[in-house]
């Protein structure tokens, strides 16, 4: 088990808040100057991930914070996109993996494509697990936090977190005056999908036709439409963390990301699918009462 999980939550609050403020400032400046395209420029391709210019802002903040954190309190391992060696990075750099007090898995901007064009909020996602070496899995995560990364037009932004076995928590920040207010987390209480949002993830062209056909057949079965108007509404929110958020606060009733299943069936390369860091805040959803299962 993790020692003093609340202290870890406090660190995540600080780090996430720095990310939110820096990215919002960059978006606001780009919006004013009409230079949003600069944030969407490809900066690098590393570890199988496309790194956009906006990603580099977040990477620098996380690296600097982890350096200070490790120097003050002892070694840690950061697991994130764009890092070589299977995404693992030890802080301080002369420490050994096995000496790390914990593993920090981080997706700095989940939904980069939403944010870099200033279209829709993305999310900073992080989870902390005891160091069980390379055998550590998402199930081992005991602390998780997700923070909304809003567009330059937003007034409010959410932050949610959980400690395993202690429930999930939510705070809303006013981006204009910095004030914060605790808020409830309440998934939908409806017992059907009718007159609500439910979706099968199909963000990109490969496999979209097959996934859309499956979606149509599925909803015809579970929410048959006998009238003129559709009963199930679709929202392709291109961020796994954002999808979980929509379920947690009752905006959505059902979401399934079956891209790897369809890609395998169709003989397509498994590109742009959900990675472990994309789903590292699943603990928050479970603690909030969302039912999370695999494809089986």
Model regions and ranges:
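N-terminal subdomain of lithium-sensitive/metallo-dependent phosphomonoesterases centered on the IMPase/IPPase/PAP
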Residues: 1-109
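An extended, acidic
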Residues: 9-12, 16-19, 23, 27, ...
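Conserved long hydrophobic alpha-helices within structured protein cores
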Residues: 56-61, 72-81, 124, 242-257
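Buried hydrophobic packing segments
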Residues: 62, 66, 124, 128, ...
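Short helix-terminating capping/connector loops at secondary-structure junctions
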Residues: 71-74, 136-139, 191-192
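DPxDG-like acidic metal-binding loop motif
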Residues: 97-165
């Amino acid at each position: 088990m993790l020692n003093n999980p609340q202290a870890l939550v406090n660190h995540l609050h600080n780090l996430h808040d720095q990310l939110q403020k820096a990215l919002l400032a960059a978006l606001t400046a780009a919006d004013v100057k009409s230079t949003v395209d600069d944030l969407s420029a490809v900066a690098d391709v590393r570890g199988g991930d496309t790194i956009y210019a906006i990603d580099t802002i977040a990477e620098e903040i996380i690296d600097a914070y982890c350096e200070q954190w490790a120097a003050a309190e002892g070694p840690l391992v950061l697991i994130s996109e764009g890092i070589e060696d299977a995404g693992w990075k030890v802080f301080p750099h002369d420490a050994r993996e096995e000496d790390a007090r914990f593993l920090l898995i981080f997706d700095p901007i989940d939904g980069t494509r939403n944010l870099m064009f200033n279209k829709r909020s993305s999310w900073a996602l992080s989870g902390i697990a005891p160091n069980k070496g390379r055998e550590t899995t998402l199930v081992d995560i005991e602390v998780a936090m997700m923070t909304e990364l809003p567009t330059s037009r937003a007034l409010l932004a959410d932050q949610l977190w959980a400690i395993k076995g202690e429930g999930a928590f939510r705070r809303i920040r006013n981006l204009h005056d910095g004030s914060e207010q605790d808020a409830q987390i309440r998934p939908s209480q409806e017992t059907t999908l009718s007159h609500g949002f439910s979706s099968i993830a199909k963000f990109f062209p490969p496999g979209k036709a097959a996934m859309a056909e499956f979606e149509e057949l599925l909803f015809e079965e579970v929410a048959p439409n006998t009238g003129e108007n559709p009963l199930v509404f679709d929202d392709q929110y291109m961020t796994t963390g954002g999808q979980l958020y929509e379920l947690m606060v009752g905006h959505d009733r059902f979401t399934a990301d079956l891209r790897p299943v369809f890609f395998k069936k169709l003989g397509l390369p498994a590109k742009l699918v959900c990675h472990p860091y994309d789903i590292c805040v699943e603990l928050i959803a479970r603690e909030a009462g969302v039912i999370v299962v695999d494809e089986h």
